[in-house]
Structures are given as C-alpha cells and as structure tokens.
C-alpha cells in the first residue's frame, strides 16, 4: 500500500472472473473493508476448470498423495506419489531445490 501512496495513483487491477461471480463471492467471504478498482476480464479456460474441480475424490478413481524433498547441502532429493490402491512411484532428483 505504501507504493500506491508514494506514486499517488491507484492502479486498476484485472480480475479474471465474471462480475456476478465475484460479487457473490465477495458478499460471502469479504475480509477487508477496501479494495482497489477492478476490471473484469475474460476468464481463461484453465481458471474455469479450477473453479469446477470436485471437493471430494471420485469413487473408484485413484487419489494421488504427492510429496518430495531434497538435502540442502548435497542438492539431491526424491519426489514421488502413492495412491490409495498402493500404486506408487519415486524418482531421484539431482541438483535440485525444495522450490522445484
């Protein structure tokens, strides 16, 4: 907010959602008393997909539990997954960080 005050001009932010969807969400979940001006732009297909994801796992479909880590000094690590049906895979990683 300090940068906005220093420059003396508030930017108009682009929100990739339809106005009606945003206003409904804002009415239910608002947490601040002030937000800058918004321009509502067309929603990319991947963002529409995100909002249509299911909340619970589908019956008889694999649920993947994913994890990974690496050693900070050697930069060697492992990443993998396991499903509720026991299918699993682990890969060794070299020259990596925990951010990748």
Curated annotation (Swiss-Prot):
GO terms for molecular function: aspartic-type endopeptidase activity; nucleic acid binding; RNA-directed DNA polymerase activity; RNA-DNA hybrid ribonuclease activity. InterPro entries: Rev_trsase/Diguanyl_cyclase (IPR043128), RNaseH-like_sf (IPR012337), RNaseH_domain (IPR002156), RNaseH_sf (IPR036397), RVT_connect (IPR010659). Keywords: Aspartyl protease, DNA integration, DNA recombination, Endonuclease, Eukaryotic host gene expression shutoff by virus, Eukaryotic host translation shutoff by virus, Host gene expression shutoff by virus, Host-virus interaction, Hydrolase, Multifunctional enzyme, Nuclease, Nucleotidyltransferase, Protease, RNA-directed DNA polymerase, Transferase. Disulfide bonds: none annotated. GO terms for biological process: DNA integration; DNA recombination; proteolysis; symbiont-mediated suppression of host gene expression. PROSITE patterns: RNASE_H_1 (PS50879). Residues 58-100 form the RNase H type-1 domain. Belongs to the retroviral Pol polyprotein family. During replicative cycle of retroviruses, the reverse-transcribed viral DNA is integrated into the host chromosome by the viral integrase enzyme. RNase H activity is associated with the reverse transcriptase. This is an African green monkey isolate. This is Pol polyprotein.
């Amino acid at each position: 907010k300090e940068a906005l005050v220093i420059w003396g001009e508030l930017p108009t932010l682009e929100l990739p959602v339809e106005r009606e969807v945003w206003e409904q969400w804002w009415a239910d979940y608002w947490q601040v008393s002030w937000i800058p001006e918004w321009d509502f732009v067309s929603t990319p297909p991947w963002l529409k997909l995100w909002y249509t994801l299911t909340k619970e796992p589908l019956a008889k479909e694999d649920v993947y539990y994913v994890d990974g880590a690496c050693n900070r000094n050697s930069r060697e690590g492992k990443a993998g997954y396991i499903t509720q049906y026991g299918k699993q895979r682990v890969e060794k990683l070299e020259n990596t960080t925990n951010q990748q």
